[in-house]
Amino acid sequence: MNSQRLCPVYRKWLQLHPANARAHRLSLQIQAQEAHQQGKSAFARDKCYQAFETAKVVLTALQPVSKSNITTAYNDIISFGALGMYLSSLLQRAYKKHEAHEVLQECQQLLIAVMPLHAANPSVCRLISAVQHCVDSKGLPPNTLPMPNVACH
C-alpha cells in the first residue's frame, strides 16, 4: 500500500521534527475519533489515514536509539499499531476489506523492519512482537509475512 495522504514536503519536515510529528499524530487521531463519533465516516477515514502515515513517519524517523528514550519508543510503536488496527476497522466498516488488509500488512512489514533498530533493547523488541501479534490477530491470515530474522531476548 502506498498511500500519499501527506504532502511530501510536510512529510519530510515531520521526519526531521519527530516531536512535532507526535503532536500532529495525536491531533489527527483525535479528529478522526471525533469525526467517527459524529458519523462522518469518510472524514474519519481520511484523518485516520493521515494519522497512520504520521505514525509511520515517526516510527521510521532517524532518532537516537538508547535506553533513555525507551518510553518514547514504546509510545511510538503502540500508536502505530493501534492506528493501523483502527484504520483497518474503519475500512472494513466501509466494505473496503482489501484496503483494510493492506493496512494491517503494512503494519506487520514496518514492525518487522524496525525490530533490528531496537535489538539492544529487549523490552522494546518484546513490545514490537506483542503489537505484531495484536495486528496478526486483527485479521491477517497466518503466514502472510515472514518472521523477523533478528533475535531479541
Please tell me what each predicted stretch does.
Residues 76-87, 131-136:
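Extended HEAT/HEAT-like alpha-solenoid repeat tracts in very large eukaryotic scaffold/adaptor proteins
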Residues 28, 77, 88, 95-96:
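A structural signal for the main folded, soluble domain(s) of proteins
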Residues 23, 43, 72-79, 99, ...:
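Structural signature of alpha-solenoid helical repeat junctions
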Residues 49-75, 109-121:
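Short, charge-rich amphipathic alpha-helical segments embedded
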Residues 45, 52, 98-105:
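Conserved positions within tetratricopeptide repeat
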Residues 1-64, 125-153:
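N-terminal alpha-helical interaction modules that lie
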Residues 27-28, 54, 79, 84, ...:
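Amphipathic, well-ordered alpha-helical segments in soluble domains
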